[in-house]
């Protein structure tokens, strides 16, 4: 079984994907810019500003997405990334998590700290930068996800356990097996 899960920052992609992987005994694949920043011993905000937004060649985007594309070919996996539903062509189930920006900003603030107004502004800016980069690099509009997914879940008013249950029900309904 292969599952691809996408959504913008603060939607619970990582949390829910890891729950799915653990429940079904699947490999959890979630390699992000945060991981690259940690590997380089650079704070994420600095890495994002200098290496993602500050470069014109999209090197790190292509590095990350190539690695995820290779990993997405493995069986018995849950791939969680912004572009998972586009990258994982052979996924048995493609899921997109959606939440209002204000809710995502609150969740990010709870996870990472900071002032709400700053987190809201940086969340908006990151969304806009991601959209521009993915359009430029891959001609992918990350706001046009409905035709690429099997299941869209609005997570604005539900917690990760409820999201997991909805996904588990869909997996069972489709009779997907590990």
Curated annotation (Swiss-Prot):
Location, primary (coarse class): cytoplasm
Keywords, sorted A to Z: ATP-binding, Cytoplasm, Kinase, Nucleotide-binding, Transferase
Gene Ontology MF terms: ATP binding; CMP kinase activity; dCMP kinase activity
Entry's EC annotation: 2.7.4.25
Class of enzymatic activity (EC top level): transferase
One Gene Ontology CC term in the entry: cytoplasm
UniProt-annotated location(s): Cytoplasm
Keyword field contains Kinase: yes
An annotated GO BP: pyrimidine nucleotide metabolic process
Source organism superkingdom: Bacteria
InterPro entries: Cyt_kin_arch, Cytidylate_kinase_dom, P-loop_NTPase
Protein name: Cytidylate kinase 2
